[in-house]
Amino acid sequence: MPIRIPDALPAVNFLRNENVFVMTDSRAAVQEIRPLKVLLLNLMPKKIETENQFLRLLSNSPLQIDIQLLRIDRRESKNTPMEHLNNFYCHFEDIQQENFDGLVVTGAPLGQVDFGDVAYWSQIVQVIEWARAHVTSTLFVCWAAQAALNILYGLPKMTRAQKLSGVYEHQTLNPLALLTRGFDEGFLAPHSRYADFPPQAIREHTDLQIFAESAQAGAYLFASVDKRTVFVTGHPEYDAHTLGAEYWRDLHAGLTPALPFNYFPQDNSDGTPLATWRSHGHLLFSNWLNYCVYQITPYDLRQMNPTLE
């Protein structure tokens, strides 16, 4: 089944060109089925690119999904046309009285910025606190995972001395876990972050269950027992070229970035990298939508039960 997005959103044609099943609002309106309401809080500067990446993963499900795009930073964007933001994004006050089946919070290029110095930190706190009563399950990605650990569990910001960039091997830890159902015991996932997620710190200071981790990248996938908060520390949504684009961007800016690990063929930056993580990225989002959202959320969202008992 498809995701449901506005007819004029650029992602419609982008995803259809990839043979992704997309349903526009006009077509979905005649279907007598309740779609899942999923809110996407997009914190990345290049919002259209990020929309495409996440909508691709959210579309690979037998469920119809009604996507609402959310922004909380009212500053003028240098990377996304204001017309696009005005046409397709809502502000928090527009939806704060509503309930949603799912919320995805993207990463943000804020790895070396203290939480208190983030321009929209108070809004991040507000959304995450709001989600506890208004969203069945929230998926935090990369920087958002670090922010949520601080807000919900009081974990201090942990930062690596060197940026973690590359495609790393991970291992699943529980063969019966629903979030990793269908995963290979070892799988690849890309990372691009300064944030550090030591498994020991998560086990000692939270009640979260870790389902996949990496000897090099640390904890990758973990969640609360009730499945209402799910954390992914990498970037399963990345395109094949994204890590390379970040590398060349930093290089051209006069920085000395390390070559992304296990990314370019034979570590030759002139080579064309392959998206070796794509299948597990799709499976992760499909499992989250099915087991953490669809199987738990009430049919009538007006009857939202924050404890999911």
UniProtKB/Swiss-Prot annotation:
The record marks 192 as: Important for substrate specificity. It is found in: Cytoplasm. The keyword Transmembrane helix does not apply. Pathway: Amino-acid biosynthesis; L-methionine biosynthesis via de novo pathway; O-succinyl-L-homoserine from L-homoserine: step 1/1. It comes from the Bacteria. It catalyses: L-homoserine + succinyl-CoA = O-succinyl-L-homoserine + CoA. This is Homoserine O-succinyltransferase. The gene is metAS.
